[in-house]
Amino acid sequence: MKDWTGNDKSIYSTLGASNHTEKERETNDYYATDPKALELLLELEDFSHFIWEPSCGEGHLSKVLKNHGFDVLSSDIVDRGFEGTQVLDFLTSEAPKGMPRDIITNPPYKFAKEFVKHALDISTNTTKVAMFLKLQFLEGKARRALFEKHPPKKIYVATKRFVCAPNGDFENAPSSAVAYAWFIWEKGYTGDPIVRWFN
């Protein structure tokens, strides 16, 4: 299966600053999100009943959403064994038919900008897009252009470090040196972002 760039090996190299060496990068840039990060977000932000998790991996975020009663569509570019995963490339996918869904995910960092842009492109003005991203996503000329066109409505900055586990292995994951934040978009919003802190 080819990845988003046409690479049939589906192995991505690291771009930008990172506490991981290129050798440590996982296939398809897979780093599972600490479920606690989403648990805390759900205490701060309301979402629609219908959610799409387009980088579901082994279901760490999808399980949290289901436990909170959401109707969750889980997909990924590869099947990592989470029951109900739809195998598809989010960047070439259309919005699900029927009820509009908010999008909540931790995208592959190398394609984070593309994930944000595509999520907003296929969203309606009634849906939210929530991305768990490195705080350094705020940097860069290309991303500045994205922010000028599509400013996030809220940015929830984590005051404590969360671990994103290589290959979903939290037991052996090293402690994190990376600052993360939840970026929340509402299509059509044109104001300044509201910055808040959590955890």
Provide a role label for each language-model segment.
Residues M1-N199:
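Class I S-adenosyl-L-methionine-dependent methyltransferase catalytic core
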